[in-house]
Amino acid sequence: MVSFKLPAFLCVAVLSSMALVSHGAVLGLCEGACPEGWVEHKNRCYLHVAEKKTWLDAELNCLHHGGNLASEHSEDEHQFLKDLHKGSDDPFWIGLSAVHEGRSWLWSDGTSASAEGDFSMWNPGEPNDAGGKEDCVHDNYGGQKHWNDIKCDLLFPSICVLRMVE
């Protein structure tokens, strides 16, 4: 198998011309700087999307750009996303949901959030699945500005992530 990487300017062209990208299909081809408008942090590129969307529409928007809604696997990532959210106190979508069969918490990039020892940043008393209809998660909520489970059809800004290859 032949292995190659596209320079950053071609990577941007490829990602921006794709309607939907299967998980990670193009990311392995990209090297160097993040696409224009994205911010690099620890070998990942992040895009703050100010337009308010439902959780599903936010995820589809991230897929359109070749990524997923952002996942948080450390305190550092959690703080970085909050800082990237333009210093706003408003909540924003992250890639955590229980919308799939089995209803355990999974990140939209396929990584688990339910196993013992996994990083979590739930507000006290969360997740509470109020009314049995809270299957998606937004960050920067409540007094502590952490995670909250909420209805997926509400509208919030979001943050997308692309994983880069070294």
Swiss-Prot record:
Further comment found in the protein's record: Binds lactose inhibiting its agglutination activity.
Disulphide connectivity of cysteines: C34-C45, C62-C160, C136-C152
Signal peptide (UniProt feature, chain positions): 1-24
The protein's name in its UniProt record: Lactose-binding lectin l-2
Species annotation: Anguilla japonica
C-type lectin domain span: 41-161
GO molecular function, one term: carbohydrate binding
Lineage of the species this protein comes from: Eukaryota, Metazoa, Chordata, Craniata, Vertebrata
Subcellular localization, as worded in the UniProt entry: Secreted
One BP term from GO: defense response to Gram-negative bacterium
Keywords for the protein's UniProt record, in alphabetical order: Antibiotic, Antimicrobial, Disulfide bond, Hemagglutinin, Lectin, Secreted, Signal
